[in-house]
Amino acid sequence: MDAKVMETFESWRANVTEEDLVKELGELAKPEAEDKLYDAFYRSLAFGTAGLRGTIGVGTNRMNVYVVAQATQGLADYLNAHYQNPTVALARDSRLKGEDFQKVAAGVLAANGIRVYVYPRIEPVPTLSFAVRYLKTSAGIVLTASHNPAPYNGYKVYNDNGGQITDEAAAEISANIARVNPFDVKPMDFEEGLEKGLIIWTPEEVLDNFIEAIKRVSIPGFKAADGYKVVYTPLNGTGMECVTRILKEIGVNDVDVVPEQAEPDGNFPTCSYPNPEFREALELGLKLADKVKPNLLVATDPDADRMGTAIPHNGDYVLLSGNEMGVLLMEWLLTMAEERGEKPQDKVAVSTIVSSAMPDVLARARGFEMRRVLTGFKYIGDQIDQLKDAGEEDRFLMGFEESYGYLVGTHARDKDAIVATMLCVEMASWYAARNMDLYEAMDALYQRYGYYLNGVVNAAYPGAEGAAKMAQIMSSLRKNPLETVGNYKVVGVTDYAECAEMPRVSGLQKEAPQTLPASNVIEYRLEGDNKVIFRPSGTEPKVKSYLFANGATREEAEARIAELSEAAQKVLS
């Protein structure tokens, strides 16, 4: 066993007092648990622009109260160095240990003289982004692991604009964290913080104003089609209150909530992987849908920043991909804007380099500007800020990621499943009044513009050996570029580690060309306007391969995706 790992382990055994963590340390001390001990202590959880994320447990490579305290002290040092009298907004989702972590984070901030606004109950991620902006705090923290399985939790940091922190801020906070001994951090008692006015319950008006901000992007004069019915599931997460409230306030009253998934439960007892993009997570919703026959099934993930849908079509339920929903919303919102007398060429939509190519085709046909940014919603938020700084915030049409994240409106700087659900319901009702479901609406767009399809190949590389393998794969793709992918010749390569120019299509393009930040992403452009992009996941030990193909028919495009998928698997094997 590595001597430094054992030194760290013994330090934890000497200092940890929490009963569950003490018990886990005892289990790790057994000879047969050597591999588990090593994995828990061989490194510290990496703090990046997405904060921290890991499985709950004891050790430097796990999420626990000591790691949360250490991270918060690093953040507190950063805030006190950059702000006079800094303040923070703090929230959590329904995950295990979330309340414990929230109290520790609030206590550390209070002990550093930083006033912190704490949501008194679980809340969706977008409400925290909104709270930072509404309360004008210096930063925000949300304790979440998005749609990861139940053993995970995380720690996500927002800047004073409600967006994820920059690479520079993350690097400085990370350096601060590295200097902190977690056992030297002494959080203020939560009740003491409340008494001293350093810990403040977030006022109810913040949530009320969040709902009002969302309603402002509702389609004017919206009225649900006669008999329109929705099935909704929050997947035992945070979306229940906000989603049901917003639907009621726009006049959608026939909403059936999946009862087994209505209440918050960090164990996620009904699905091991509460990710609304997968049919397995929607099984209970589909079962209820079979009984009540809705027009639409909507699911939000545990922190309610992502939304998935199932569409009743020809006696079955079809799941739309994140790309398809993004394209549908984009085209429909543009149509709604035109009906209000707004010009398409004035509008700006933003997506990522790994999302569908179809919005570029839409932009050329309809005249709006389409911008492509790096993966991560903070980059979409940056584009909103640029429009705001130019006095053109109203040009923002929408932003979306292929991973089921959408934002319409400028009330937040992160993806928002609450506003996405509202608009998806309105859009589906609009099409229903025209005797179309969303699957048929999407197919109509494919027939008009071409079948631009996508696929993803994930290759998992867990543990210390996995991290080295991931680095080796990306290095090899740079040093020994592919000449073909499947039967397709490579016609161009973009290495985003070299700060490539931001791709833009159509529109006014009044600003000078923008350069994207350096990122560990490699794009291979293939003949026939097909494409493959490789990048390591920012939150999981995986290398992802994003596949792009098009065809005159669905079958043709699907065959090309299958061929690219097989080739990508060989590259990642």
Pin down the residues of each PLM region.
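Gly/Ser/Thr-enriched, mixed-charge loops and adjacent short helices
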Residues: 12, 16, 20, 36-45, ...
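N-terminal small/polar loop signature for handling phosphorylated ligands or for N-terminal nucleophile
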Residues: 89-152, 249-309
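Active-site phosphate-binding/coordination module
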Residues: 127-185, 302, 313, 402
